[in-house]
A protein has these predicted regions:
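Charged, amphipathic alpha-helical coiled-coil/dimerization segments
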Residues: 51, 78-138
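N-terminal helix-turn-helix DNA-binding core of bacterial DNA-binding proteins
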Residues: 20, 24-69
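C-terminal regulatory/oligomerization modules of transcriptional regulators
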Residues: 1-7, 53, 57, 131-152
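C-terminal ligand-sensing/allosteric alpha-helical core of TetR-family HTH transcriptional regulators
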Residues: 7-25, 45, 69, 105, ...
Length: 152
């Protein structure tokens, strides 16, 4: 049986610590915008998909893009809808699905929040450089947002 790694050399523990530090920085930066981290991710994903795909995204497409659970995505989108940041409507293709789009105020907030988060990311990942950070993270967790949109 081999000896376990010292904590300073444990990749899992190091990743855990880095993730917590990054999440704390993001959470603090989003607080003045009255957004939680998950609300930001889903609002920004909705905005990005609306801007970059030919049809309004469904809740399922947003969940797939963000890598979030479908049920949790639905709950968070409902909360964003209650705040007037997104509109959810029956999907014209699939009556079971809901299409989502940001409202004008949701789009403004998404743009502002993305700029805030990108600034945090720039500073946070500066010690290793953005390209190296993206290369490593892409190898560890392939970008699911590049998957093709689902029909549902």
């Amino acid at each position: 049986m081999s000896a376990s790694l010292p904590p300073a050399e444990s990749p899992g523990l190091l990743l855990w610590r880095v993730t917590l530090a990054w999440q704390r920085a993001i959470t603090a930066a989003l607080r003045p915008l009255d957004l939680t981290h998950v609300q930001f991710v889903l609002l920004a994903s909705t905005w990005w998909l609306t801007e970059n795909e030919s049809v309004p995204p469904t809740q399922r497409r947003i969940a797939d893009h963000a890598g979030t659970d479908a049920m949790m995505t639905s709950q968070v989108l409902r909360a964003l809808e209650a705040r007037g940041l997104v509109e959810r409507r029956p999907d014209p293709v699939d009556a079971r699905a809901r299409s989502v789009r940001p409202t004008p105020s949701g789009e403004r907030l998404a743009r502002e929040a993305v700029a805030v988060v990108e600034a945090i990311d720039h500073d946070f990942f500066a010690p290793v450089g953005s390209r190296d950070a993206v290369a490593l993270l892409t190898r560890l967790a392939p970008d699911r947002s590049r998957s093709t949109p689902r029909e549902s």
